[in-house]
Amino acid sequence: AQIVMTQTPSSVSAAVGGTVTINCQSSQSVYENGRLSWFQQKPGQPPKRLIYRASTLASGVSSRFTGSGSGTQFTLSISDVQCDDAATYYCLGNYDCSSGDSFTFGGGTEVVVKG
């Protein structure tokens, strides 16, 4: 069966200094509960990895970004939201398939920041 990553909400508006929570639900448990990453993408730029193994912060990424969850339910939280956080965020699940690893992206969440 096709693996589906469902992200909610599809769009969210936040005030500067506020908090944003993005959810990612997988139709199949993520391999080893750790192969879940979060990416940030801005227009005209390649995706930037923020979180890997569900909760590990990538090098150089602000600690305002926090990842949590396991199995089929994962969350990305952004605290003390800044204008520079305006972007689209994606979860990426890695699944162990008999034919090899399979990667599936969520549909994305647009974060709009209001001053």
UniProtKB/Swiss-Prot annotation:
What protein name does the entry list?
A: Ig kappa chain V region 3315
Further information: This chain was obtained from antibody to type VIII pneumococci and was isolated from the serum of a single rabbit.
SMART domains in the record: IG, IGv
Region ranges (Framework-1): 1-24
Q: Where is this region: Complementarity-determining-3?
A: 92-104
Q: Any idea which UniProt keywords this protein has?
A: Adaptive immunity, Immunity, Immunoglobulin
| InterPro entries linked | Ig-like_dom (IPR007110), Ig-like_dom_sf (IPR036179), Ig-like_fold (IPR013783), Ig_sub (IPR003599), Ig_V-set (IPR013106), IgV_Light_Chain (IPR050150)
Q: Where is this region: Framework-3?
A: 60-91
Can you supply a Gene Ontology BP term from the record?
adaptive immune response
Pfam families the record matches: V-set (PF07686)
> Entry's PANTHER family?
IMMUNOGLOBULIN LIGHT CHAIN (PTHR23267)
Tell me the segments the record calls region Complementarity-determining-2. 53-59
A cellular-component GO term for this protein: immunoglobulin complex
Q: State the residue spans of region: Framework-2.
A: 38-52
Specify the taxonomic lineage. Eukaryota, Metazoa, Chordata, Craniata, Vertebrata
Taxonomy, superkingdom? Eukaryota
Record region (Framework-4): 105-114
Give the region (Complementarity-determining-1) as residue ranges: 25-37
